[in-house]
Amino acid sequence: MNPFHDLEPGPDVPEVVYAIIEIPKGSRNKYELDKKTGLLKLDRVLYSPFFYPVDYGIIPRTWYEDDDPFDIMVIMREPVYPLTIIEARPIGLFKMIDSGDKDYKVLAVPVEDPYFKDWKDIDDVPKAFLDEIAHFFKRYKELQGKEIIVEGWEGAEAAKREILRAIEMYKEKFGKKE
């Protein structure tokens, strides 16, 4: 089984999507799901003394403008193991440009954690935490000499629109998967 191609994007898209976690919160290792094999590979170790502030992964059967699956960040109280599948509720959209490519990311919370039951939109997330995430992405490739432009945050509706668009982009690239 290849989780990228064989899982649906979610049980109730775009309200609830599957997040396949590649990188646990607190890691300096950047793992990526290999699109061909479905195995996890080490892409690189971050050059900076930074660590991922959230669990980070992809939404299956999506594709985005950076020529990769659509990224998703899941706010968890404890880090989860790579390749964990989380039913996640999109609450926001982080907008950034990475080396000239649009590289937007969904921000989500786990459906099955009562701690986040009232988090429905970006305004429910403490601003200080959003600032930490933005700071991480602004600086994490700096020592590699790559430029990141942070455009800011949008709410849940923008995230849901981009998820639906990323599903259509997947279908265009890989053909409709039944």
From Swiss-Prot:
GO CC annotations, alphabetized: cytoplasm
Subcellular location: Cytoplasm
One MF term in the entry's GO annotations: magnesium ion binding
Any Pfam family matching the protein: Pyrophosphatase
UniProt enzyme class: hydrolase
GO biological process, one term: phosphate-containing compound metabolic process
Binding residues annotated for Mg(2+) 1, in chain numbering: 66, 71, 103
UniProt keyword terms in alphabetical order: Cytoplasm, Hydrolase, Magnesium, Metal-binding
E.C. number: 3.6.1.1
Catalytic reaction list: diphosphate + H2O = 2 phosphate + H(+)
Highest taxon of source: Archaea
Cofactor: Mg(2+)
Binding site for substrate: 30, 44, 56, 140
Residue positions binding Mg(2+) 2: 71
Entry-linked SUPFAM superfamilies: Inorganic pyrophosphatase (SSF50324)
InterPro entries, alphabetized: Pyrophosphatase, Pyrophosphatase_sf
Function comment: Catalyzes the hydrolysis of inorganic pyrophosphate (PPi) forming two phosphate ions.
Similarity remark: Belongs to the PPase family.
Protein name: Inorganic pyrophosphatase
Source organism of this protein record: Pyrococcus furiosus (strain ATCC 43587 / DSM 3638 / JCM 8422 / Vc1)
